[in-house]
Amino acid sequence: MSKQVAHSFSSEDFSFIKQKLAREAVALVEPGMRVGLGSGSTAREFILALGERVRNERLAITAVASSRISHLLAQALGIPFLDPALSQELDLVVDGADEVDANLRMIKGGGGALFREKILLQSGKRNIILVDERKLVSVLGTFPLPIEISPFGCSSVEKVLNQQGYIGDWRKTSHGERFITDNGNYIYDVSSPDSYPHPEEDLIRLLQIRGIIDVGFVIAKAEVWVGYADGTVVRKEIT
């Protein structure tokens, strides 16, 4: 099923789409499940919806969050947690993405939690990525590619990246300081190249550079649920 992407959105449209996606995804959660909680605005809506079910239905589940922000929100809603060091497998992981191409390859990490998000996806028996139609692209690269880098030797890592043609900037906070991930690392946002027709090749190349912790490409089996401004949700999966 294919749809045309809408060209005009309001903030109300965005909120409605995210809430609808979250409600449909949270309906899949069953008692006893171990649930992976992603990061970002769409994942936030899922956490809110899950917290409502936990409160209203006394739904007995446990969770692992991919970021401190998601953890604190879920904790405030009364969602119980697993020890992330001991959770080998999750029944369901729900997250968002910054871009998704026609082959369901993605760029993630706009919120700076890409390393932990990818660990949860690796652990998930079923992975669902929730996006609105704006996130669909023909080729990845419109959104800057986040790379998580160790502070130790970060300048030399940047030099190697630049030599290989990956040009960008260190992510900064609103106060102008370097953004630090929950793992204590930096994020380097690559803006050039601005097109990745073969992200698998770039991923392999980048992970060979010492000092790079992880890269924002996600090339993994996942369902992608796309919400449209007319209220429909299309579920995509590469089989």
Swiss-Prot record:
MF annotations from Gene Ontology: ribose-5-phosphate isomerase activity
Q: Which GO terms describe its cellular component?
A: cytosol
- Cite the EC number: 5.3.1.6
Q: What are the catalytic residues?
A: 117
Q: Does the keyword Isomerase apply?
A: yes
Decide whether keyword Isomerase is in the record. yes
Provide the catalytic activity annotation: aldehydo-D-ribose 5-phosphate = D-ribulose 5-phosphate
Q: Which Gene3D superfamilies match?
A: 3.30.70.260, 3.40.50.1360
The UniProt entry, under InterPro entries, shows: NagB/RpiA_transferase-like (IPR037171), Ribose5P_isomerase_typA_subgr (IPR020672), Ribose5P_isomerase_type_A (IPR004788)
Binding residue positions for substrate = 39-42, 95-98, 108-111, 135
The UniProt keywords, alphabetically, are: Isomerase
Q: Which of the seven top EC classes does this enzyme belong to?
A: isomerase
Q: Which SUPFAM superfamilies match?
A: D-ribose-5-phosphate isomerase (RpiA), lid domain, NagB/RpiA/CoA transferase-like
Q: Which pathway is recorded for this entry? A: Carbohydrate degradation; pentose phosphate pathway; D-ribose 5-phosphate from D-ribulose 5-phosphate (non-oxidative stage): step 1/1
Q: Which CDD domains match?
A: RPI_A (cd01398)
Superkingdom = Bacteria
Q: Which biological process, per GO, is one annotated for this protein?
A: D-ribose metabolic process
Q: Which cysteine pairs are joined by S-S bonds?
A: none
**What HAMAP family does its record include?**
Rib_5P_isom_A
The record's family statement is: Belongs to the ribose 5-phosphate isomerase family.
Query: Function of this protein?
Result: Catalyzes the reversible conversion of ribose-5-phosphate to ribulose 5-phosphate.
Record's subunit section: Homodimer.
The molecule here is called Ribose-5-phosphate isomerase A
**Record organism:** Chlamydia muridarum (strain MoPn / Nigg)
